[in-house]
Amino acid sequence: MPESKYRQQTIRAPRGTVLTAKSWLTEAPLRMLMNNLDPDVAENPHELVVYGGIGRAARNWECYDAIVDALTRLEADETLLIQSGKPVGVFKTHDNAPRVLIANSNLVPHWATWEHFNELDAKGLAMYGQMTAGSWIYIGSQGIVQGTYETFVEAGCQHYNGTLAGRWVLTAGLGGMGGAQPLAATLAGACSLTIECQQSRIDFCLRTRYVDEQAATLDDALARITRYTREGKAVSVALCANAADILPELVNRGVRPDLVTDQTSAHDPLHGYLPSGWRWEEYQKNAQSDPHGTMQAAKRSMAAHVRAMLAFSKMGVPTFDYGNNIRQMAKEMGVENAFDFPGFVPAYIRPLFCRGIGPFRWVALSGDPQDIYKTDAKVKEIVAEDKHLHHWLDMARERIHFQGLPARICWVGLEWRQKLGLAFNEMVRCGEVSAPIVIGRDHLDSGSVASPNRETEAMRDGSDAVSDWPLLNALLNTASGATWVSLHHGGGVGMGFSQHAGMVIVCDGTDEAAARIRRVLHNDPATGVMRHADAGYDLAVECAVEQGLNLPMVAATQGKG
């Protein structure tokens, strides 16, 4: 690895109200960049890796230093441009323009392959930004807990009469994203068995209470699951092993889970999925010396993994892909029916997307957990009738360990995001919280992503692969005045399979911030309603009418028919 991609340095975002940069609008991206690399947040901060295989916050350490320097000196009417983790320019714009514009991992489609990307990465010409790693709004595993929780709850409604009590989930992967699964299952009332090949990741999840227990062997794990489900307890169990070995063994034994999914880093066969029979150190070494052979070995193991998932599905066990592209990898290795089980979005989440409901998250730049608890109370006050949301916030406060700067996530839609943002801004203005708050989201949202094997799988009109939508989302957020806007490629599912956009806006208590919040936090989720209404979803059309959207080709929004 080039020296510039490794540095033995501990980074933590500043806390409190003393500015390092010239304003809160530049202090915010500076703190969030640093927060992404906090050792309590990032998977491998010394190599700038935040999560998701090789999802990095900056291209190399020289680029990181230059970004920090640029943000520190950036004026109120200037915009910093980031090209795949490298600061390439500062330009005069205006006060309401974004302070940072980010483009990560974008390749011309014909060349959008892991092989070509890895060549560029090795030359220092590119960086994989994942979704929130390179866009500086990662908040640790909490960032996906509620989405996973909502998925499990909906699965319980569809398959088990509304409850997962006495049921168990079989899955794999305890990285930055997958680590949310066991806690989400517990919060949804289910037991879970999560297979993870790296003991260090299990240790982290045990320490942060995302996992309750570790089993010594498969027999021990199954005995625990049997006991807890019989007792009606929701307990999460981790097992250090390879999913490509364990799932086929469970099929051979005739073991029948109640839900099966997966969140290994299968999207990146060179860095994210340990081939069966290999040690992790061997995998890392071979990735350098024989990348093609390593990728093929990983994909062969994925094929075995998916065949086992297909076997569970054939047994009648609800089985779904949780967005890591493992079905595609298996299909490339000859598993022709890999897509016989669905992805989680068409199976459980799309009705939420139709209403612009998605992962709304915010971070207290003060570093004070009390600021988050106060905003939790404000959300309950404003969204007063949503008891499901209140239950989520109560559970989150009790069970979720803050990683880095205190943060919260809750899934809310077009109707509420603007109202919550304005309320948070007012809390900053009147001193109810001790410092500004940033509001962002995952790129996994209703209008900000094109990903035919994940968020846009099986769209009603067949527009799964149309990536105009995330481009329009990024352009509109830029025009609306988001504090920083990002446009990425390959997040979640790997090179060639997705394009997606993100935005973050700062609530600094000013009238100018309030005006930007009104635009951004309405327009951003509205693009999701627009995208789904355009695809012919009645629920999205109804939401568009209710919220007064002007969609020229959707007759109902024009007062016709």
Swiss-Prot record:
One of its GO terms (biological process) is L-histidine catabolic process to glutamate and formate. The active site is at residue 410. Disulfide bonds: none annotated. GO terms for molecular function: urocanate hydratase activity. It is found in: Cytoplasm. Binds 1 NAD(+) per subunit. Gene3D superfamilies: Urocanase like domains, Urocanase superfamily. This is Urocanate hydratase. It comes from Salmonella dublin (strain CT_02021853).
